[in-house]
């Protein structure tokens, strides 16, 4: 067995709020083909942690580190077909004892552990061995957690048939196979307004159109989809465990009737560091009115962000088509944008910025599966913001001359975001880096 020191070197796997359940990796054995691991429920749970509705660990489930497949011959690097790439990908061998296969949720946790260990891997193979493995293969494929091994474009008589399935990092972080309900695990279930049931208990929100026409200093006249109702004021909407900080990042729907929420916004907007860019310094009553208007506006939502239980930032998330952004950019029906400020200077720095920047965009793409682009309008000379955006897959669509500034009209496609971002560790200067394998 590994030493306790080696165990501490392995990353924790933690469910998001409201569960915060902690799981630990244990090395069961080691051999010439690498180490064999088991994911166990930690005996050292933090205060407030609760068990998920279904058992997500399996006492008889073991998996290997990612290692090269057993094939004697691999396709040449010049063959870049899906079949050839899958042949060359690393594989985890998964075994279990007993008469029943693990659940899809338990395989999801195993995949979560592997991506926590190897966040830079875009995909890998799972090779299952145990009772009802064919049924489990089919269930994982049906949930989108995995896909069948690709078929070669041309017959390959020199290669044996591979029954493994392929797991995609992009699919996993979009919520494929999530065991915590019909929405991705990182979206915290919350009631909308005075509703008695979760929106996720109903069919997907229908597509129907309405018209927004307002003649203000930034005129808007556009047809766009009717937007879903916002979560209840004060409700949590997103949560994710950040391994390199050993903290949870979360976002709550700001409640302008809550004096604590209002006072935070008021204090931050009157900070000269914030006011120079936001230009919203004012009285408490002015800020209450500002937030009330956002609360009543279906095209945007005000959000407070926190690490663990300490609020540090304010975000505005908007639908681009009925925003003034739509005047400068040909927004699609479900495109969204965001504005952000860090109000608590203790939480500045690239090691934290990378965590919340990733999470904010992650939330936007998860909240509405039809959102294909996230857009923005940072000041064209704001190098740090443009740098963080670029690290997350954004590119400058064009310059936009707004009444108060020249902006870089940036956009990031869903496909690009989930290709670029690995949700892994970061360096001391905040740039993303692959985790060193601890396996």
UniProtKB/Swiss-Prot annotation:
Localization (cell): Peroxisome
Residue intervals passing through the bilayer: none
Induction behaviour: Expression is induced during iron deprivation and is regulated by the transcription factor SRE1.
Pathway annotation: Siderophore biosynthesis
Gene Ontology cellular component list: peroxisome
Key word Acyltransferase present: yes
InterPro entries: Acyl_CoA_acyltransferase, Acyltransferase_MbtK/IucB-like
Main enzyme class: transferase
Primary location class: other
Name of this protein: Hydroxyornithine transacylase SID3
Native source species: Ajellomyces capsulatus
Protein encoded by which gene: SID3
């Amino acid at each position: 067995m590994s030493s306790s020191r080696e165990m501490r070197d392995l990353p924790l796997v933690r469910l998001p709020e409201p569960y915060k359940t902690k799981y630990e990796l244990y090395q069961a054995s080691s051999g010439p083909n690498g180490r064999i691991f088991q994911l166990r429920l930690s005996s050292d749970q933090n205060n407030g942690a609760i068990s998920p509705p279904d058992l997500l660990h399996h006492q008889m489930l073991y998996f290997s580190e990612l290692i090269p497949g057993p094939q004697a011959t691999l396709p040449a690097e010049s063959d870049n077909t899906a079949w050839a790439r899958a042949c060359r990908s690393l594989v985890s061998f998964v075994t279990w004892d007993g008469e029943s296969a693990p659940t899809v949720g338990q395989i999801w946790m195993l995949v979560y552990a592997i991506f926590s260990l190897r966040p830079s891997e875009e995909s890998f193979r799972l090779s299952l061995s145990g009772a009802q493995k064919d049924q489990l293969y089919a269930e994982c494929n049906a949930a989108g957690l995995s896909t069948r091994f690709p078929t070669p474009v041309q017959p390959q008589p020199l290669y044996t048939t591979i029954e493994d399935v392929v797991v995609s990092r992009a699919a996993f972080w979009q919520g494929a196979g999530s065991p915590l309900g019909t929405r991705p695990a990182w979206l915290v279930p919350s009631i909308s307004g005075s509703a008695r049931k979760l929106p996720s208990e109903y069919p997907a929100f229908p597509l129907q159109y309405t018209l927004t026409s307002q003649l203000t200093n930034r005129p808007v006249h556009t047809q766009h989809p009717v937007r879903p109702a916002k979560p209840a004021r004060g409700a949590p909407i997103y949560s994710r465990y950040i391994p390199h900080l050993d903290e949870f990042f979360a976002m709550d729907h700001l409640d302008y009737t809550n004096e604590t929420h209002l006072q935070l916004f008021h204090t931050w907007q009157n900070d000269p560091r914030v006011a120079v860019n936001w230009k919203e310094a004012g009285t408490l009553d002015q800020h209450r009115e500002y937030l009330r208007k956002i609360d009543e506006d279906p095209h945007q939502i005000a959000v407070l962000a926190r690490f663990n239980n300490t609020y540090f930032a304010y975000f505005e998330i908007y639908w681009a088509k009925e925003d003034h952004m739509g005047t400068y950019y040909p927004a699609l029906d479900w495109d969204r944008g965001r504005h952000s400020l860090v109000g608590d200077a203790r939480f500045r720095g690239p090691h934290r910025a990378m965590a919340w920047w990733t999470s904010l965009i992650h939330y936007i793409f998860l909240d509405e599966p039809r959102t294909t682009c996230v857009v923005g309008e940072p000041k064209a000379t704001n190098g740090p913001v443009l740098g963080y955006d670029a690290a997350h897959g954004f590119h400058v669509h064009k310059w936009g001359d707004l009444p108060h500034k020249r902006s870089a009209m940036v956009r990031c496609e869903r496909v690009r975001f989930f290709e670029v971002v690995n949700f892994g560790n970061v360096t001391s200067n905040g740039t993303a880096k692959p985790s060193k394998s601890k396996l």
